[in-house]
Each structure stands twice: as structure tokens, then as C-alpha cells.
Amino acid sequence: MNLHEYQAKQLFARYGMPAPTGYACTTPREAEEAASKIGAGPWVVKCQVHAGGRGKAGGVKLVNSKEDIRAFAEQWLGKKLVTYQTDANGQPVHQILVEAATDIDKELYLGAVIDRSSRRVVFMASTEGGVEIEKVAEETPELIHKIALDPLTGPQPYQGRELAFKLGLTGKQVGQFTKIFMGLATLFLERDLAMVEINPLVVTKQGDLICLDGKLGADGNALFRQPELREMRDPSQEDAREAHAAQWELNYVALDGNIGCMVNGAGLAMGTMDIVKLHGGEPANFLDVGGGATKERVTEAFKIILSDDKVKAVFVNIFGGIVRCDLIADGIIGAVEEVGVNVPVVVRLEGNNAELGAKKLADSGLNIIAATSLTDAAQQVVAAVGAK
């Protein structure tokens, strides 16, 4: 679950990390009043969406008058911002962040992720702030400095100082950076984050460090013990189908193709998408119904898949290990009857009670194509789309 920049900076402040004075505003009038609270300009106004690339898309602007602030707010509030990280529809802008402008001398990068290979929280710092860290990693990886946190001792000040020296910081900046590092690491661990990024972390003309931007991603599996973060969720920034699927404990990701996929198990789901592509098809989604699939969840999964107007056929690929194929068959039959499926449905069942499941599908009298193998299923669903 991602947070907005203004929410990230609210958390930064509580962990002793410096950020520009700013206010999140929902109306043009609020935006003007925020400028008055901050004091003399110039100011920076930023659209609040869960996507990068806002500046290039016109969603971040340096302004010198309150009239410009009002004009920016009127231009964007209630509209959608399209960046290289969004789809063609963009994401809705419901808040504008108004901040005091900062005199920048140098831009740095500081971020952290969970490194699955080392099973540690790893901090990354670079002198190449203000640009995509992925680009830096690809072109000049030697400019990224890493520190892994020991899960027993947690973050240590010496690690912050070590990174500060590698970034070329001196004097009071070393202490300031160490404080930011310790605050960010504590925030990461206490709030069950999956990713955090300060890009850029700037050195001002006065020689001080300030968190100019903030990006936080919380671990969705830990939200049950993070009630404050749950309250910060902005459903408007999420795909409506993905949000609805999450309520049913379905892992759904919308894609751009026209073959809906319903599979149990993330690995099998990815393999299913691969074999659809191999035979010339385009998956419309990733959907994992999980190991504990019920008739109700399968029915809901069908509804979610078919809510996408692009879907011209549905591929159901079930391996019965924990889940019984006959129960999945009941769910498929119930969904087809309840939803009124008007597109071809190709089903491949294998494993626990697969024969019973296949018999139920055959006896249902519905227009469901039973496949004999994974390859056969992929070929049939691609052919079904081509025939429409």
C-alpha cells in the first residue's frame, strides 16, 4: 500500500526528519491560505498522486504568487494526472501540496527496501539524487552505496556516518544525515514498511539537509497491526477491480490484454500468462484465487474478470492440491449461471478430484470448454478469442 508524499512527510516529522513546511489542500482557497501560513514565496505546488514523473507531466511547479497557486489548484484538483508511471487514464488529483521553496545546492538519494536474497533491510544512498535510482543502478551502479541492517541490533549510528562519508558530506552534515538515517530506519521497522525513498534528499545553500520528497510503501500483509497506516489508504489511487479483489483476498492485477485468467497459486498464474503469450494471446489480468478458494470467491473472481470490457475469453487453470477441483467446478458453474457469462470459458483442472470436477463441468450443460492439458487449454482460449 502506497502513501502520498504529504502523508510520508507527516511521518518523517514524527521521526525527527526535516522537511519543508507545507500543507495538503483540497480546494484552491485552501491552497492560497496555505501560502499565507508558510510566509513569503516562492512556493512549490505539487499534485498528490501515487506515481512518479509528476514534474515532467506538469504536476509540480515553482510559483511566485498566490494567484499562480490558485490557478494551479484550479487546473489540477478533480482532474487526472498522466505520467510515465500511470496508465493512459492517469490518476485523480484530490490534494495539492503547497510547500516553501528550498534553495538547493546538492541533490542526494536515500532509500530502503527489503532485500529478499540477504533477508535484510538494505539502505541505499547515492550522490545521484533527483533521478530514477533504477537508471543509476543500470548505468553507474558504483555510485550506489549500500548498508544492511542487522535484524538483532537494528540500525546503528556508525552506519549512518559511513554512508554520509561515502556521499562526501562533512561537518554538521554528517550528524544531520545520521539523524535522518536513524529516523528513517526506525520508521521503516516500526511501521512495517516494504519500501521508502527520499529522492531527492537535498543539501541547501545554507549547508543543511532536508527531505524534499518522500515515498513510502507499506507491507500490505502487516496492515492488520498498523491501524494508522490503514486510515491513510487512498482507494481512489488504486484500480477499482484490484481494490475490490483485495476485499475477497484475491490477488488481482489488471493488464492490457483480452484473455481473463483465473488461477490458484502465484507461480502457476505467472506460468499461465506466459503460455498464453507463447501461443499468441494477451492476458487481461493476473488473478490468484489462492489455496483456500471457495465457491463464493471463485464466483467473485469471475465477476471481477468480466467487469473488464476488454475480456473476450476466460482461462481457468486450477491445480488441485489444497483446493479441490470439484469445488472449483461448482464455483465456475455457479458464476457462469449467476453472472451470465457471454464469452468462451476454457477450463483446465488437474490434481485433487480433477476427474470429478471435469464431470461436473461436462454435466452442467453450459458452454464451458474442458481442456486436456495446459498447452491444449492455452491454444483453445487463444483460438476462442481469435474466433470472436
Swiss-Prot record:
> Which cofactor is essential here?
Mg(2+)
Q: In which pathway does it act?
A: Carbohydrate metabolism; tricarboxylic acid cycle; succinate from succinyl-CoA (ligase route): step 1/1
* Stored InterPro entries: ATP-grasp (IPR011761), ATP-grasp_succ-CoA_synth-type (IPR013650), ATP_grasp_subdomain_1 (IPR013815), Succ-CoA_synthase_bsu_CS (IPR017866), SUCC_ACL_C (IPR005811), Succ_CoA_ligase-like_bsu (IPR005809), Succinyl-CoA_synth-like (IPR016102)
The record's remark on the cofactor is: Binds 1 Mg(2+) ion per subunit.
Which EC class does it fall in? ligase
Give the keywords, sorted: ATP-binding, Ligase, Magnesium, Metal-binding, Nucleotide-binding, Tricarboxylic acid cycle
SUPFAM superfamilies, sorted: Glutathione synthetase ATP-binding domain-like, Succinyl-CoA synthetase domains
Binding-site list for substrate: 264, 321-323
Q: Where does Mg(2+) bind?
A: 199, 213
Give GO terms for biological process: succinyl-CoA metabolic process; tricarboxylic acid cycle
Q: Which residues form the signal peptide?
A: none
Q: Looking at the UniProt record for this protein, which Gene Ontology cellular component terms does it annotate, in alphabetical order?
A: cytosol; succinate-CoA ligase complex
Q: What is its EC number?
A: 6.2.1.5
Q: A single GO molecular function, which one?
A: ATP binding
Pfam families assigned to the protein according to its UniProt record, in alphabetical order:
ATP-grasp_2 (PF08442), Ligase_CoA (PF00549)
Q: Which domain of life does the UniProt lineage start with? A: Bacteria
Q: Which residues bind ATP?
A: 46, 53-55, 99, 102, 107
Reaction equations catalysed: succinate + ATP + CoA = succinyl-CoA + ADP + phosphate; GTP + succinate + CoA = succinyl-CoA + GDP + phosphate
Task: Report the residue ranges that make up the ATP-grasp domain in this protein.
Answer: 9-244
Task: Family membership, please give it.
Answer: Belongs to the succinate/malate CoA ligase beta subunit family.
Known function? Succinyl-CoA synthetase functions in the citric acid cycle (TCA), coupling the hydrolysis of succinyl-CoA to the synthesis of either ATP or GTP and thus represents the only step of substrate-level phosphorylation in the TCA. The beta subunit provides nucleotide specificity of the enzyme and binds the substrate succinate, while the binding sites for coenzyme A and phosphate are found in the alpha subunit.
Under the subunit heading, UniProt states: Heterotetramer of two alpha and two beta subunits.
The UniProt entry, under HAMAP family, shows: Succ_CoA_beta
Matching NCBIfam families: PRK00696.1 (NF001913), sucCoAbeta (TIGR01016)
Please give the name of this protein: Succinate--CoA ligase [ADP-forming] subunit beta
